[in-house]
Amino acid sequence: MKISVYCSSAPDIDPALIDFAYELGKGIALAGHDLVWGGAKISAMGAVARGARENGAKTIGVIPRSLVDREIQDPNATELHLVDTMRERKALIEELSDGFIALPGGIGTLEEFFEIWVGRYLLFHSKPIAVLDPIGAYGPLREALEHLAGHKLMKSGQNELVSWTTQVEEALSAMAR
């Protein structure tokens, strides 16, 4: 199975979250899976790739050429696909992946997560989705989503398409759904 991980590329996030990203990559590898990710060597993105690669997984990166120009691509990726736009990046990651895990991240991570969630709801794919949040960063987001559902602004069944987890093992188990 090829598992996509959406996560932060921010340079100043908590080092514990970077360590956690490494552990997720390691868990992906030890479970016999490969990693698909945004192709960067920095922050949580770099850590998840190192964790996967150092434990035997293939690492398949998808990165826009403009980021290669900034030299943040992972030169050790097993495969590195270069694309022109973020839309192409997201589409290729979706195509290459069999499941998706979102770690805490910023607006880029959220945008990727929501797009893949909407795609699942609209039946463009049937691949599993998990949020892996060991620090409670997405707690307010989850509350907001429940608030929307309470006002009937979310359709029945949408929330059930995402597994909300706090541990690597839980997120990896969700990939088998």
Residue ranges, per PLM feature:
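Flexible, glycine/proline-enriched loop segments at strand-loop-helix junctions
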Residues: 103-104, 128-132, 159-162
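A cross-family phosphate/adenosyl-ligand binding-site feature
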Residues: 1-96, 134-176
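Active-site/ligand-binding-proximal alpha/beta "capping" segment
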Residues: 88-123, 130
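Arginine/glycine-rich "motif VI" loop of SF2 helicases in the C-terminal RecA-like domain
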Residues: 53, 119-127, 153-154
